[in-house]
């Protein structure tokens, strides 16, 4: 991995700058009853992934990620209910974790930008730093909105919560730029519009963040 062209004002990312060699291997386990289970109105998905670095190269670390999903339809399959939980741990044993190795909240928390939560440098650019840990829970429902079925338009609602946290280094040498890397819960809720079109399904989300930090970057529509 190579981190380059880092702004001089970003002391924490300057520490990460440079190239490292890495050789890793991993495995994944999954259990999915959504298509094959006896209960046609619901199912679960369980997934466990783990990667190991250290056989060769400059990085000695373990990356673990888990996902659990449960879904069910009710009222003659007209309404669907779904809950998704995710979590991850990155444990590096030979030095500090780097930007390219950490977790970010991309796609895991609606109501915020892709890198909108988690530890953030306090410099001019306010760069997202990622975290060694992440956890999220997303709850959502899909339902008809009263339009004819041929329109292909349905509605939804959701509530998300989670966090990205944990750095091995929270301050650069000789700097008072201390980063908040503690666990701070974020949450957001909103509504969705689903539209089945000839070019594929479209989804529009309107959301509002309820729990957030002053340095987070929210996103009310996507």
Put a short name on every predicted segment.
Residues 26, 191-200, 219-222:
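Outer-membrane beta-barrel "beta-signal"
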């Amino acid at each position: 991995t190579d981190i380059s062209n880092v702004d001089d004002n970003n002391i924490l990312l300057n520490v990460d700058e440079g190239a490292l060699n890495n050789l890793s291997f991993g495995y994944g386990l999954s259990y999915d009853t959504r298509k094959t289970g006896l209960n046609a109105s619901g199912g679960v998905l369980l997934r466990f992934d783990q990667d190991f670095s250290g056989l060769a190269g400059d990085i000695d670390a373990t990356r673990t990620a888990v996902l659990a999903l449960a879904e069910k339809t009710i009222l003659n399959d007209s309404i669907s209910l779904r809950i998704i939980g995710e979590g991850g741990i990155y444990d590096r044993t030979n030095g500090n974790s780097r930007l390219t190795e950490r977790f970010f909240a991309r796609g895991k928390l609606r109501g915020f930008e892709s890198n909108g939560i988690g530890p953030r440098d306090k410099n001019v650019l306010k760069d997202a730093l990622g975290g060694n840990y992440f956890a999220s829970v997303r709850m959502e429902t899909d339902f008809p909105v009263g339009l004819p079925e041929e329109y292909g338009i349905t509605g939804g609602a959701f509530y998300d919560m989670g966090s990205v946290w944990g750095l091995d280094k929270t301050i650069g040498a000789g700097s008072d730029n201390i980063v908040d890397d503690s666990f701070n819960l974020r949450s957001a809720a909103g509504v969705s519009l689903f539209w089945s079109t000839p070019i594929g399904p479209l989804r529009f989300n309107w959301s509002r963040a309820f729990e957030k930090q002053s340095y987070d970057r929210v996103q009310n529509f996507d």
